[in-house]
Curated annotation (Swiss-Prot):
Keyword Ribonucleoprotein: yes
InterPro entries (UniProt xref): Rbsml_uL18_euk
Family from the record: Belongs to the universal ribosomal protein uL18 family.
Protein name: Large ribosomal subunit protein uL18
Physiological role: This is one of the proteins that bind and probably mediate the attachment of the 5S RNA into the large ribosomal subunit, where it forms part of the central protuberance.
Pfam families according to UniProt: Ribosomal_L5e
GO biological process terms on file: ribosomal large subunit assembly; translation
Coiled-coil ranges from the UniProt annotation: none
Length: 196
């Protein structure tokens, strides 16, 4: 892989796809508190981070695994409703810690309207955190999981075998997917009532 004498190797964390140094530089210069949202294959992680020369300090954090362990969430841990609940949980914790505003940091993810990252940010905004963002393009039905419930009902009627395979974890945890919107409201009320 020859490049020539003028080739400049990028920083390691940029090569690994972990850090966008141009954006990070602007956050550091402005000394802003950041709402960091990261998606993994299984979970959603949301954190409030402040810059420190020795390394960023995480002030408060929320992990979608907490929804299952502390609040009894039986749905998937990385879908749209879980993203909203994780963001909402982070917003409640941030307000308790005295943080009232933050700037959204989505890292190297491509910003797509209605995505899970923006759903988590919307959850934090609805909890009372002030975050300067434009139109997030998120529909309330998708936040509550109505689209998942309607797809599950349609699939159960057309192909019960595929339904059992795709929604096996829901059924294993004791939640029928058609009940997801009501279960979402139940967990949201638990978080609102001081469960954070």
């Amino acid at each position: 892989m020859a490049h020539g004498p003028n080739y400049r190797v990028k920083y390691r964390r940029r090569r690994e796809g972990k850090t966008n140094y141009y954006k990070r530089y602007t956050y550091v210069i402005n000394n802003t508190t950041r709402l960091v949202v990261r998606l993994t294959n299984k979970y959603i992680i949301a954190q409030i981070a402040k810059f420190n020369p020795k390394g960023d300090v995480i002030v408060v954090a929320a992990h979608s695994m907490e929804l299952a362990k502390k609040f009894g969430w039986k749905g998937d841990l990385n879908n749209t409703p879980a993203a909203y609940l994780t963001g909402y949980l982070l917003g409640v914790r941030a307000l308790k810690a005295g943080i009232k505003e933050a700037v959204a940091d989505i890292g190297l993810f491509v910003p797509v309207k209605g995505s899970r990252i923006f759903t988590a940010i919307k959850g934090a905004i609805d909890a009372g955190l002030s975050i300067p963002v434009g139109d997030l393009g998120i529909k309330e039905d998708r936040i509550k999981g109505v689209h998942i419930a309607s797809y599950a009902q349609k699939l159960e009627a057309e192909n019960p075998e595929l339904f059992k395979r795709l929604f096996s974890k829901y059924l294993e945890r004791g939640l029928h997917p058609k009940d997801l919107p009501s279960h979402f409201e139940e967990i949201l009320n638990k978080i609102k009532s001081g469960g954070a």
